[in-house]
Amino acid sequence: MKRQIDYSLYLVTSSSLIAPGSTIERQVEEGILGGVTLVQHREKDISTKCFVERAKRLSEICKKYDVPFLINDRIDVALAVGADGVHIGQDDMDCALARKILGDDAIIGVSTNNIEEIEKAAADGADYVGIGSIYETNTKDVKDRLIGITGLRKILEHVSKMHCQLGTVAIAGLNSSNIQRVIYLSEANGKRIDGIALVSAIMCSITPRETAKELRNLIATPPCFAQARSSLTTPKDLLNQIPAALQKLKDFTPLIHHLTNAVAKNFSANVTLAAYGSPTMGESYDEVADFAKAPGALVLNIGILENTKTYIHAAQVNNDLARPVILDPVAVGATTARSKVINTLLNYAYYDIIKGNEGEIMNLAGEQGLMRGVDSISQHTLAARITAVHRLAVERRCVVAMSGAVDVISDGNSTYVIKNGNPLLGQITASGCSLGSVMGVTASICQNDKLLAAITATLLYNIASELAVEAKNSCGDLLVQGPGTFIPIFVDKLHQLINETIKGNVDWIERAKLEKAE
């Protein structure tokens, strides 16, 4: 009878990566004692005789602890040593033939990279599939098979709908720094990856038992940045919580670290100050860890593409400290290079709030979104925008905010539209970028409810624009005559709204046009 398999911590051996002074046998046994649940023995450039001898020793260790032992590729070696099964690649023996040779009780896994390979493996009788490559790895060249978290999630979404039991294991480039992110962000339709396959993390460790324990704990524990869905389920509930949230700014000034484009820096800094935040625009890779130590948030407004390494590092550092990260994927879809960079960012870090205009969000949601430079060209119905925002929020397990004449905001559970604002916001440079700054402030004070944070920021921003165009001088004349006069009055009104709220005057909230999308 075929045994039940725990794929959680899947160790792939490598005799070329053994920690100094250790042996492959010691690394495997210590790894098992620390929590390894399955061992796959892989050898390269070694004689069959040596392969069999080493495999026998490892097989005995695995039997001692009742841990399944698989052989990579070699059906003959698996038979010779009495292994529990094999793992085969796309260029190895066909899975159906391997099943015929090894029998129904053998454990057979297949390396896969796409849905077609998944379907074939299942049809051929595979027990599980190794899915990847998730990231690049030093153990082999996988550049032509990289799928990232985005690709892994699409595959798991497909597997969740298959009418068969098929184990899933993520492979390539995985270690203690990224496995929680991969597990959390790849989950689809309730289907979570069954296991994480690692090589160097354990084989290179001088303390493999402790390393395996740490890895098992990480696999079983949600990441610190995991986002709970809002408990507020109606517009009234949300609006009632805004005053209490903004009151926190009376005694707390969050540091809002911006990695933004040059044209937005000045305005974003002024808006951050008006919103009771403290702006910093440091762009050095070496500074981001120090900035993240201060309570606040990170705003990634994608400007210079050459700063990708810094963007990723900054997001990951803030993820590790559970600091909110706001991503503004500026002009994604406008150029191939920009889309590639933003896709990389999505695969290497978590973002609490993704905000953008219609074109940007529709592109990320997999829909056609027209861009004219950094500007969006509206072409979708409100219903289509609501659907796209909700879907993207579900996929990325975050809050998504689409700005426009009507704003759409969702946490994947509840979706809302906001019908406040003035068209002059669209006629000044960096108005969208600076909304991200306000979201950074509100996310810092709404740590447990990023939906409330995004809605609060958007209402503040939009209502401030309405009040600005209504402002009059002592003679009764309108102060705002166009985009140029709008900017300073808008910044003033934004500051006044928060200041009045702190004092207890919340009449402005009555202007909110917040509706729940059906």
Curated annotation (Swiss-Prot):
Kinase in keyword set: yes
Induction and repression of expression: Repressed by thiamine and 5-(2-hydroxyethyl)-4-methylthiazole.
Cofactor: Mg(2+)
NCBIfam families: PRK09355.1 (NF006830), thiE (TIGR00693), thiM (TIGR00694)
UniProt-listed Gene3D superfamilies: 3.40.1190.20, Aldolase class I
Role according to the record: Condenses 4-methyl-5-(beta-hydroxyethyl)thiazole monophosphate (THZ-P) and 2-methyl-4-amino-5-hydroxymethyl pyrimidine pyrophosphate (HMP-PP) to form thiamine monophosphate (TMP).
CDD domains: THZ_kinase (cd01170), TMP_TenI (cd00564)
Record's catalysed reaction(s): 2-[(2R,5Z)-2-carboxy-4-methylthiazol-5(2H)-ylidene]ethyl phosphate + 4-amino-2-methyl-5-(diphosphooxymethyl)pyrimidine + 2 H(+) = thiamine phosphate + CO2 + diphosphate; 2-(2-carboxy-4-methylthiazol-5-yl)ethyl phosphate + 4-amino-2-methyl-5-(diphosphooxymethyl)pyrimidine + 2 H(+) = thiamine phosphate + CO2 + diphosphate; 4-methyl-5-(2-phosphooxyethyl)-thiazole + 4-amino-2-methyl-5-(diphosphooxymethyl)pyrimidine + H(+) = thiamine phosphate + diphosphate; 5-(2-hydroxyethyl)-4-methylthiazole + ATP = 4-methyl-5-(2-phosphooxyethyl)-thiazole + ADP + H(+)
The enzyme's E.C. designation: 2.5.1.3, 2.7.1.50
Organism domain of life: Eukaryota
Pathway: Cofactor biosynthesis; thiamine diphosphate biosynthesis; 4-methyl-5-(2-phosphoethyl)-thiazole from 5-(2-hydroxyethyl)-4-methylthiazole: step 1/1; Cofactor biosynthesis; thiamine diphosphate biosynthesis; thiamine phosphate from 4-amino-2-methyl-5-diphosphomethylpyrimidine and 4-methyl-5-(2-phosphoethyl)-thiazole: step 1/1
PANTHER family in UniProt: THIAMINE BIOSYNTHETIC BIFUNCTIONAL ENZYME, THIAMINE-PHOSPHATE PYROPHOSPHORYLASE
Protein name: Probable thiamine biosynthetic bifunctional enzyme
Cofactor comment text: Binds 1 Mg(2+) ion per subunit.
Source organism of this protein record: Schizosaccharomyces pombe (strain 972 / ATCC 24843)
Residues the entry annotates as binding ATP: 355, 403
GN (gene name): thi4
Enzyme class: transferase
Family: In the N-terminal section; belongs to the thiamine-phosphate synthase family.
Molecular function (Gene Ontology), one example: hydroxyethylthiazole kinase activity
Keyword tRNA processing carried by entry: no
Ligand binding (2-[(2R,5Z)-2-carboxy-4-methylthiazol-5(2H)-ylidene]ethyl phosphate): 137-139, 173, 199-200
Region (Hydroxyethylthiazole kinase): 230-518
Location of the region described as Thiamine-phosphate synthase in the Swiss-Prot/TrEMBL record: 1-229
Binding site for Mg(2+): 73, 92
